[in-house]
């Protein structure tokens, strides 16, 4: 009996964020590919280059001295469970959120820095 695409999708939907990240890295190794999105460069004018960025990624660079406070802040910001938040914090540098607005990214950065973490907004 073969597994359907729907069953695979349901199984992935039930995984934690850390499990999905691990699955992606295993797939990258097995198939020799990268999950990074391919960027096509279009021959556009300078107006396109001047466009302001609207989506930002929040990256935890370093934990700092107060690891417990950082884990609490990550849990609050991401909705992860305690173990997943701890694993994510300990794997720094790690991307916490992707594609968030500038205001949300700056708020998250401020909260995490108050907890003692080093954070970058890209």
Swiss-Prot record:
SUPFAM superfamilies (alphabetical): ClpS-like, Ribosomal protein L7/12, oligomerisation (N-terminal) domain
Biological processes, Gene Ontology terms: translation
HAMAP family in the record: Ribosomal_bL12 (MF_00368)
Gene Ontology cellular component list: cytosolic large ribosomal subunit
Pfam family, one: Ribosomal_L12_N
Annotated family: Belongs to the bacterial ribosomal protein bL12 family.
Keywords assigned by UniProt, alphabetized: Ribonucleoprotein, Ribosomal protein
Organism: Sodalis glossinidius (strain morsitans)
Function, in words: Forms part of the ribosomal stalk which helps the ribosome interact with GTP-bound translation factors. Is thus essential for accurate translation.
Protein name, UniProt field: Large ribosomal subunit protein bL12
This protein's encoding gene: rplL
Source superkingdom: Bacteria
């Amino acid at each position: 009996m073969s597994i359907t695409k729907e069953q695979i999708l349901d199984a992935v939907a039930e995984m934690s964020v850390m499990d999905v990240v691990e699955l992606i890295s295993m797939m990258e190794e097995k198939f020799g590919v990268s999950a990074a999105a391919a960027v096509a460069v279009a021959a556009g004018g300078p107006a396109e280059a001047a466009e302001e960025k609207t989506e930002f990624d929040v990256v935890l660079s370093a934990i700092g001295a107060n690891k417990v406070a950082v884990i609490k802040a990550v849990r609050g910001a991401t909705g992860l469970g305690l173990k997943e938040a701890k694993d994510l914090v300990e794997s720094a540098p790690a991307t916490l959120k992707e594609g968030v607005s500038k205001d949300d990214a700056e708020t998250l950065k401020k909260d995490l820095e108050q907890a003692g973490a080093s954070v970058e907004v890209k």
